Amino acid sequence: MRIFATAIAIAAICISGLRTSATDWNECVLAAVDSFPERGGYYTGGRPNADFSKTTIQALNEAFQMDSADNRPSFTPALAQPSFCSSATYAVLIKALLMWDTDNAISREAWENMRPLATEDDGFGFWGRANANGPGLGVLVHELGAGNNIAAFRGAYSERNRESDNERYLSDEEWAADSVWDKATPGDFMKLFWNRNPSGSDSGAVIGCNNVAGDDQERGHSVVFLGYEPNGDIRYWSSNGPGKDNRNLGYSIGSCPRSHVQRVVVTHITRPDRFDNARQMPPDSENRFLSDLNGRRHATTAEMLRQIGAE
């Protein structure tokens, strides 16, 4: 998958270790994106089926290989198929860290804790944080001290989801002009909370899932930000789906108008060396905020901002 004409030069910067700034990290992310195949299938199921001989988590484990004698893993993007959105951003993060870490700043213990495990539910361990509802990757980066997050919210459309009496749903023009869009850099990670108000749902105002019948539940997308189209639409890479034929979906570039997003979290990694702190994040370590978003409750905007360090 070729995204930029400078992809080979970007990869050379990462692999050579000629890194001087956070911008170079973002270039490693873009080079990592470029190493992934196109499509490969979109699948969120927990068991193989007639369309997919393995699940996404099984595919991730095949792609992430580290034996007992290895100080760091290898990650083979071609094996990480099928996929879904948060598996794609997790996989790109791992690949980018491997491209960036030419000086072995990240310990074997940290790498081992980054291994994706099917036993890690949302909010548990490294993978369980990256895969969680809400701002999972943003919380993970904040916990590790590896970067910063910014967030913006258009407001709830319905009274039932408003957090205060003075909360207002911004017009398309106001939302498109929000300063958050100017602060995102290609190679940043984004969590997009979809605006589904035209269909009668206010799910874009909701953070997490509470499994209460009749309540709106979060509908979001974990992506790598690539920039903007000439008309201002958001351009991103992820595993995009579902659709009519999930076998022909998966890794791809997508775009959407800003009006299709109701809430956004932008995660900007500035200290990739701090991913070594994952050595203190074993598979059974729990982030209760994230684990609660997996069927127990919704979060408020204020709670989310605290958890991602963006108060």
Question: Where are the predicted features?
Answer:
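...with weaker cross-activation on analogous glycine-rich loops/strands in unrelated enzymes
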Residues: A110-K244
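N-terminal capping segments
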Residues: L18-L144, A299-E311
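Positively charged n-region of N-terminal signal peptides that target proteins for export
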Residues: M1-A5
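Bacterial N-terminal signal peptides
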Residues: A7-C14
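Low-complexity, Gly/Ser/Thr/Pro-rich intrinsically disordered linker/tail segments
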Residues: D233-E311
